[in-house]
Amino acid sequence: NRWLTEKVLPDSDGRFYSMLSLPFNDAEESLRQVEKFGDRKHVGGFMVTTVRNTGVHENQYMKVYRAIEERGLVLSFHSGPNWAEPIFKTCNRFLSVHALGFSWYNILHCTNWVINGMCERFPKLPVLWIESGLAWIPFLMQKLDHEYMLRPSEAPLLKKKPSDYMRDMYYSTQPMEIQDMKALECTFRMMNAETQLMYSSDYPHWDFDLPSTIYDLPFLSEKAKHNILGGTAARLFKLQPRNEKQKENLKKFGNLTAAA
């Protein structure tokens, strides 16, 4: 974090913005990192890499979330597979672990985040879920809504359905499942992709997505493409337009206010 904020970002001439890492296994150190680096220029927020054995709703993290929220920054959870996890040791193919792992951990943490009322406790804290694909989102929306309607007393902090909270959060595209275009279109509709989804490439990994993955989707409007490919990120992270063309596009689609 020190290297990024003292060397990389200052030397980038405004071209780089960064999410800083949180040492999530140590809540007190996580808070110190936010307090020390959270106000540095071109820092957009803080990122938690896959948490495997700690609940994101545990009380030890409340001061961390509050500190990020007070600074107007973004909290993100970046998922990833772990073949060393006992349950995943039953998988005998990388394909299986890769398919399940990236989605599974964010499913787990998103469930704990929503059901434990974190969206109500930190209503001004934008939350971003990274590198889990998109297919898990409508699945989890439906499952949590179903369970919540049967047992609302177990989620006393909620003031609306779990899916409504999930539609208020943000998601990265990669790796986007494009095999069934109708299913993908339904996913985009359910998650309010036009305002909540942000393109990510994951380059140079072997399964990276080109910008054309979004631009070539036949069911997206021009505004939706603009938002997903950069407009939403400009609004969320308060990115400054670097030239008049960028400024015109942000203004055209309603994303300039926070960016300029």
Question: Can you describe what each PLM-predicted range is?
Answer:
Residues 2-10, 32-35, 116-117, 125-126, ...:
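Mid-to-C-terminal alpha-helical segments outside catalytic/metal-binding sites
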Residues 79-83, 114-168:
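Aromatic-lined glycan-binding groove of carbohydrate-active enzymes
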